[in-house]
From Swiss-Prot:
GO terms for cellular component: cytosol
Record EC number: 4.2.3.5
Gene Ontology biological process: amino acid biosynthetic process; aromatic amino acid family biosynthetic process; chorismate biosynthetic process
Organism domain of life: Bacteria
The protein's annotated pathway: Metabolic intermediate biosynthesis; chorismate biosynthesis; chorismate from D-erythrose 4-phosphate and phosphoenolpyruvate: step 7/7
Organism the protein comes from: Bartonella quintana (strain Toulouse) (Rochalimaea quintana)
Co-factor requirement: FMNH2
Record text on subunit structure and interactions: Homotetramer.
This protein's name: Chorismate synthase
InterPro entries per UniProt: Chorismate_synth (IPR000453), Chorismate_synth_AroC_sf (IPR035904), Chorismate_synthase_CS (IPR020541)
Residues holding NADP(+): R48, R54
Pfam families: Chorismate_synt (PF01264)
Amino acid sequence: MSHNTFGHLFRVTTWGESHGVALGCVIDGCPPGITFTLAEIQSYLDKRRPGQSRYTTQRRELDQVEILSGVIVQDDGATLVTTGTPISLLIRNTDQRSKDYGSIVHQYRPGHADYTYDVKYGIRDFQGGGRASARETAARVAAGALARKIVPGLIVRGALIAIGPHNINRDRWDWLEVENNPFFTPDAEMVPVFSDYIDTVRKNGSSVGALVEIVAENVPAGLGAPIYAKLDQDIASSLMSINAVKGVEIGDGFAAACLTGEENADEMRMGSDGKPVFLSNHAGGILGGISSGQPIVARFAVKPTPSILTSRRSIDVDGNDVNVITKGRHDPCVGIRAVPVGEAMIACAIADHYLRHRGQVGRFER
């Protein structure tokens, strides 16, 4: 299985399976001299970690990150400095229950990658879904924590803005609220609504989809290039690579199709500091594939977890009709834990373009 690497200069290769001994990533192209601590990386992993509420999978993983290469430990024993060589990060699996998947050894779960993996490779890892499991994304979150360190002042924040048919009220958006509830939602009034809805979905043995929004601030103008190296192209690719993501939009996205040219145009004026000021941000911070200096705004849709407890029609590996019921521990709404994953992937895409711009142009916005 190829294509496990993302990026051009800041390259992240993830490895490992959901029910293997461990998983992790190798980061190649990280500049030397970047300082960080394992505690900083761990804080992002803790945000994604399973088993922290009844709204996520009850699989209990500590997700303690270990660093194997590419850094020098400073005198304080905590600060690490990158050397410019490959950085290897490892996260051990400690709570696998492969026996839960015994009933689907020869069956394909509807909506899952079981069938397509088998068609392509002639073999599949039925234990937890292997590389098709959301567990694979833990390593991406670790890489994203380092990516944030490369672009000076970069802030990447995500929020869950819809679960099933329930949407937040954007007038109540509060970034401080995101860290105060298990849904990472910026609308405090939607917390009990989301809670009741997911409780109902879980009791019915089913799952539900979600919508996530990511905002990246302090992104320099000039990142990206026309045609085949557009920043929004790579951001979309990074988000679509996340397991269970089925759609991505930048800025107003599909809503732009309903606007007129006057409504959609991000008009400009010169600010008092001598720098351009945009009067709106319909483009989501990217014009012609190049960052404008405005906040980059992206949203992605996460499908319902296909591993559910209700009976569904499918076939087995011999072509026989079967009814499938999936046992095991699964997220009733995997979109919740996709928030830190989306943050990480956008951070990696921006860091990669930052290094590419620095190498090609050598300067940033005036």
